[in-house]
Regions:
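Short, conserved beta-turn/loop elements at beta-strand boundaries and strand-helix junctions
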Residues: 71-75
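Sec-dependent N-terminal signal peptides
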Residues: 4-14
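Lipid interaction determinants
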Residues: 16-63, 76-142
């Protein structure tokens, strides 16, 4: 009986301590020029993308993405695209991450994102068919 209790406690502790990065995370901050920026990073199974935009206007600033893996608290990303530094494409970067239920932190550069989505399927999940568009106020359907 003691073995089963010990096994249960061990498994429970492991499941509590290993939070998933899967989902969406958001961070708001000031650029070096004093402009308010928002970055959103989305992690799915094995792929991530981060986009940065101006908080006030929504204007696009920067994006990168690629594959990722997590070994303990070390995340490794292989860059597949980078709008600001195309020479990074194909490179790998590794860094320490701290993940809990609500935050994703990179302690090396003091950055912290807040969870905005847990990655579970929502009402809009699935394939979409774009059957038309609006141009100059006129609706065109396929």
């Amino acid at each position: 009986m003691k073995k089963y209790i010990f096994l249960f406690i061990t498994l429970f502790c492991l499941s509590v301590s290993s939070q998933s990065v899967i989902g969406a995370w958001e961070r708001s901050y000031l650029s070096e020029e004093g402009e308010k920026l928002t970055s959103v990073v989305i992690f799915s199974e094995g792929y991530q993308v981060i986009s940065i935009f101006k908080s006030d206007s929504g204007e696009f600033v920067y994006s990168n993405g690629g594959t990722w893996s997590l070994n303990g608290d070390i995340m490794t990303e292989k860059v597949e695209f980078d709008t600001g530094n195309p020479e990074r494409v194909g490179s790998e970067v590794s860094f320490k991450v701290i993940v809990d239920e609500r935050t994703l932190s990179l302690p090396e550069n003091d950055r912290k994102w807040n969870r905005i989505d847990d990655g579970n399927p929502g009402e809009l999940q699935g394939a979409w068919l774009m059957a038309g568009r609006v141009r100059d106020g006129k609706k065109r359907l396929r």
